[in-house]
From Swiss-Prot:
SUPFAM superfamilies: Ribosomal protein L14 (SSF50193). Belongs to the universal ribosomal protein uL14 family. InterPro entries: Ribosomal_uL14, Ribosomal_uL14_bac-type, Ribosomal_uL14_CS, Ribosomal_uL14_sf. This is Large ribosomal subunit protein uL14. Gene3D superfamilies: Ribosomal protein L14 (2.40.150.20).
Amino acid sequence: MIQMQTNLDVADNSGARRVMCIKVLGGAKRRYAGVGDKIVVSVKEAIPRGRVKKGDVLQAIVVRTSQGIKRKDGSVIRFDKNAAVIVNKQSEPIGTRIFGPVPRELRAKNHMKIISLAPEVL
């Protein structure tokens, strides 16, 4: 569950390391974002010579949450940290690689490019 002011790790090679959620997209009074939801983020920490720099305001897709995801069979998938992938306006990843596992629920939200780049789909 991601809300405003939540800090997230970046799970791609766009150049950002840490971002902070400044808005949850998808409704006027929407408060929380889960896996597969689009958020607006501000870059808080970036590497030198990356595609993005500190202070940039971008869109991102949440790929991992520490709260977890409940599945139909009753199982719950939790991750150690919250993570997101930086995307452009067409929801395509800016980076060319994705680090760490991503959940299968991204497929239902039509983020196929993220799933194809991920090393492991849980």
